[in-house]
């Protein structure tokens, strides 16, 4: 039935799509993919003229197998698979004893509004794993510290699309798609002691963006949870966006919460910067205004700040699709700190530490899941953003690549990234259902 609808929709829309492919303006910047990818990273990305059309460019590389291959890492580092046969691994948490918790699951399922939603959904699904999400937490243990995680077992199951994880004073918090829940945790335990207790519910109606990123404040008093929008650009109306496209601050003891920062379309990963205690996020920006708009980004998250969605992007660049317009909100919008490139789909972020060594000792690792709405795929790798004096400084460096075989095939898609205290980068790959571990070889 869906295939029939897709074919019917594609035929019906073909004449209009052909017209929509005409550039929105005659300037070189408005020509399809005229903006170099390198020009769209950093604190001041190039922003071309928007291109409107019924259908964006769509290409998703099909799943390929790793075989004997492994991802590519810089000289002086090695990479190994420490866990396989997972069920859609998303985010990870390194526990005090070195054990690793992996959140596995899939959520969402928002009703389709338009024929092109069915088409886009069909295209996106071509690049996904055929494995059903586990809706569980898996625990990995390397008991003798030799880098081989000989234990892989279920810590907790029957969860509801778990994503964000945080450990605070003996409480393990899990951000399901509909609630933050809490398990009691004792160092070294391998399974949860009974079902979790709900700390607070989270917006889950419609669930266009279902992932709930989470991290804890440096003092453990608060949890920060990222809640994505219920649409690309308010197609369901502003009422459907109540309590969405924002980061909540939640009291870890009582569950009381407030909006911490707003106007962030889809904050997919959160982390606290060591030393400063500052909250940082990666976010996925809006679609359907061209292959080179709008850059996904890495940014510090300021208390009370508005980051533009849906009324504007990258500060105060107005998006007329959001109706009714709100000039007052646009005037208050601030630009993010650092562009990662349009449609790279950043889903993970973790700050480095000195143990990672060399040029990778000070900065942030970002997992880029990869694009679906560009004719030339971007992302599909982990990049390192160097920092200086607490801020991004310099161009991103490919740190884990080799996922993308060519434009039509990919072996993996990075999601969560986590640096452990020993100086290893962990990468969750939700296509090959693998956890990769990258370590210095010195």
Feature names for model-found ranges:
Residues 1-20:
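Gram-negative bacterial Sec-dependent N-terminal signal peptides
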Residues 99-101, 171-174, 222-226, 278-282, ...:
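Conserved beta-propeller blade signature
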Residues 95-98, 167-170, 216-220, 271-276, ...:
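Residue-level detector of Asp-centered blade-edge/turn motifs that repeat once per structural unit
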Residues 148-171, 176-218, 229-232:
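Asp-box/WD-like beta-propeller blade repeats and closely related beta-sheet repeat scaffolds
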Residues 418-442:
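Blade-level signature of beta-propeller repeat domains, shared across WD40, Kelch, NHL, RCC1
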Residues 92, 165, 214, 267-270, ...:
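Hydrophobic core register within WD40 beta-propeller blades
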Residues 30-73, 109-113, 119-128, 132-134, ...:
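Beta-propeller domain segments
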Residues 81-86, 153-159, 199-206, 259-263, ...:
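Surface loop/turn motifs at the tips and blade-to-blade linkers of beta-strand repeat domains
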């Amino acid at each position: 039935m869906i295939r029939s609808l897709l074919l019917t929709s594609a035929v019906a829309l073909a004449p209009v799509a052909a017209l929509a492919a005409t550039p929105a303006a005659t300037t070189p910047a408005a020509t399809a993919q005229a903006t170099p990818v390198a020009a769209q990273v950093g604190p001041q990305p190039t922003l071309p003229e928007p291109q409107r059309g019924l259908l964006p460019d769509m290409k998703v590389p099909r799943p390929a197998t790793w075989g004997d291959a492994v991802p590519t890492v810089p000289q002086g580092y090695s990479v190994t698979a420490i866990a396989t046969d997972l069920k859609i691994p998303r985010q990870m948490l390194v526990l005090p004893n070195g054990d690793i918790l992996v959140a596995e699951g899939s959520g969402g399922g928002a009703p389709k509004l338009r024929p092109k939603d069915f088409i886009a959904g069909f295209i996106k699904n071509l690049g996904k794993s055929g494995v059903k999400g586990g809706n569980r937490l898996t625990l990995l243990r390397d008991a003798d510290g030799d880098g081989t995680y000989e234990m892989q077992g279920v810590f907790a199951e029957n969860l509801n699309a778990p994503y964000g994880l945080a450990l605070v004073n003996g409480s393990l918090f899990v951000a399901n798609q509909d609630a933050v829940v809490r398990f009691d945790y004792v160092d070294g335990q391998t399974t949860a002691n009974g079902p979790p207790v709900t700390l607070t519910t989270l917006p889950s109606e419609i669930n266009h963006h279902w992932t709930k990123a989470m991290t804890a404040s440096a003092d453990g008093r608060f949890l920060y949870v990222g809640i994505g929008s219920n649409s690309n650009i308010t197609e369901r109306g502003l009422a459907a966006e109540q309590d969405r496209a924002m980061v909540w601050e939640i009291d870890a003891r009582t569950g009381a919460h407030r909006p911490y920062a707003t106007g962030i379309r889809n904050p997919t990963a959160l982390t606290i910067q060591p030393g400063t205690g500052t909250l940082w996020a990666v976010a996925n920006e809006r679609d359907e205004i061209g292959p080179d708009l709008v850059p996904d980004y890495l940014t510090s998250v300021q208390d009370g700040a508005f980051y533009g969605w849906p009324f504007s992007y990258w500060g105060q660049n107005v998006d007329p699709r959001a109706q009714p317009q709100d000039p007052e909100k646009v005037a208050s919008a601030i630009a993010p700190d650092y562009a990662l490139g349009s449609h790279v789909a950043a889903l993970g972020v973790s700050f480095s530490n000195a143990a990672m060594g060399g040029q990778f000792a000070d900065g942030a690792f970002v997992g880029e899941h990869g694009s679906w709405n560009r004719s030339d795929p971007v992302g599909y790798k982990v990049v390192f953003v160097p920092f200086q004096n607490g801020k991004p400084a310099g161009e991103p460096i490919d740190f884990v690549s080799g996922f993308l075989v060519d434009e039509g095939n990919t072996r993996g898609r990075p999601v969560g990234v986590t640096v452990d205290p020993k100086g290893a980068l962990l990468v969750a790959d939700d296509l090959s259902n693998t956890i990769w571990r990258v370590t210095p070889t010195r």
